[in-house]
């Protein structure tokens, strides 16, 4: 489990429309209710470490309720587009002491859920999404953000440490 209390201004591509971009541009679009199906796909990718054929964990259905069913667009999120192709996304989950995900630290600090499509890994999309989500959380009054990453996900660990996250605890497998 990681927490980030540095709120940084997003310095990557501004939020705009995928319709106004070329195929090489990275565009972040505010996630809406109509993106729920794509967020569900991204949630699957977080559970299987991006393995399209991977088996979901035993807790997948229970976790889906918190991470997807309870998410509403007013909680915040972004979809990354590379041209006209969705490349990943991030969404904020504002847990309570009673209902929360693996990365919950405390009420008022949103937990991020993030995934990038395999074909776009290593292109800075995860960084752009994290910066956008961090800025959004700051604008929404959060003193920090948190996330959870599986112990075996070394690539994600490197990214989060590089961006200033600190490990603040461990839960089984995370």
Question: Where are the model-predicted features located?
Answer:
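A short beta-loop-alpha structural element at the N-terminal edge
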Residues: 26-41
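Active-site rim helix/loop that mediates acceptor-substrate recognition in acyltransferases
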Residues: 43, 54-82
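Conserved acyl-donor/pantetheine-binding loop and adjacent beta-alpha core of acyl/acetyltransferases
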Residues: 81, 87-113
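A short, internal acetyl-CoA/4′-phosphopantetheine-binding micro-motif in the GNAT/acyltransferase core
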Residues: 111-121, 149-150
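Conserved acetyl-CoA-binding loop-helix of GNAT-fold acetyltransferases
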Residues: 122-135, 158-162
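Conserved GNAT acetyl-CoA-binding A-motif
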Residues: 137-148
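Conserved beta-strand-loop-alpha-helix junction that forms the acyl-donor binding cleft
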Residues: 147-156, 173-174
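Conserved acetyl-CoA-binding loop of GNAT-fold acetyltransferases
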Residues: 161-170
């Amino acid at each position: 489990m990681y927490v980030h209390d540095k709120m940084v201004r997003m310095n990557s591509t501004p939020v705009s429309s995928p319709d106004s971009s070329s195929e090489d541009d990275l565009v972040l679009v505010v996630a809406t209710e109509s993106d729920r199906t794509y967020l569900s796909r991204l949630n699957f990718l977080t559970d299987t470490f991006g393995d399209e054929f991977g088996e979901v964990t035993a807790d997948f259905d229970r976790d889906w309720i918190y991470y997807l069913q309870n998410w509403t667009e007013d909680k915040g999120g972004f979809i990354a587009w590379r041209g006209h192709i969705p490349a990943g996304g991030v969404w904020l989950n504002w847990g309570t002491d009673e209902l929360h995900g693996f990365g919950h630290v405390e009420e008022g600090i949103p937990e991020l859920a993030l995934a990038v499509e395999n074909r776009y890994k290593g292109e800075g999309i995860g960084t752009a999404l994290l910066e956008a989500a961090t800025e959004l959380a700051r604008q929404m009054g959060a003193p920090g953000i948190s996330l959870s990453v599986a112990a075996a996900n070394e690539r994600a660990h490197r990214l989060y440490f590089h961006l200033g996250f600190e490990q603040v605890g461990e839960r089984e497998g995370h």
